[in-house]
C-alpha cells in the first residue's frame, strides 16, 4: 500500500478492540447487517476487510466469505481471530477471485482508502455473478471535504460544520490514537459515476443515524451524518 496502513496497523487493531469503534457499533453495524437479512446470499467478498470484523459477522450469519486486504498485519490478525476463515493479502484493484464467483461484494468503509476507485469498482463488478449485490458503507463526501475545517464556531458562537473544495478529488491525511492514514476525498458524483459506468444499478441509499446511544457525539452525528450506505446491483 501503504497510505499509512502498514505503519498504523497495530494502533488500528488496538483502537478497534474486539467490539469495533463507535461509528461501526452505533451507526453502521445494524443497517449493514439488515441489508444481509434473509436474502439467501451464499458467497461474499469483503473488499478491504481489515482485521476481518465484518467477515466474522457474515460467517456467523451463514455466508461463505473471502476477506481481502493489502495490509499484511491486518490479515494476520483476521486469521488469528478466525482461523477457519479465508483471508488473503491482496488489493481491491486486482482481486484474486474468478469472474462471477460471488453473489455479494462488501466495502465497509474501504472505498475511501482506495487509490484507483474505478479499478476497484470494476473488480467488484467482475467477481459478482449476474444480479449480485455490491453493499457499500462509506464516509460522506462532505465529511471528507471538511478537513481541516470541520466543526467550528460562527461569529455568533453557534457551532457549525464547514466544508471547502468539495469538488476537488484529493488525498486527506487523518490522525488519531497513534493511527495516521490517507483517505481520499471524492465528491459523491465521482462515486456515483464510477459505479454507474461499471454497469451497476442503485437499489438502496441511506444516511444512517446513531442508535442505542445519546450524548454530544450522537447529537453531532444526527446534525451531520458521518456515513452513507448504498446497495448496487449487477445487471442480470
Give short role names for the model-derived ranges.
Residues 118-133:
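A short glycine-rich, Lys/Arg-flanked "PGG" loop and its adjoining helix->strand segment in the class I
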Residues 104-116:
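A short SAM/SAH-binding and catalytic strip from SAM-dependent methyltransferases
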Residues 93-104:
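A short acidic, Gly/Pro-enriched loop at the edge of an enzyme's catalytic core
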Residues 200, 218-236:
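Core SAM-dependent methyltransferase catalytic element
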Residues 45-47, 51-94:
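Class I SAM-dependent methyltransferase SAM/SAH-binding core
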Residues 171, 183-205:
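Short alpha-helix
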Residues 1-39, 53-57, 74-77, 134-169:
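Conserved class I S-adenosyl-L-methionine
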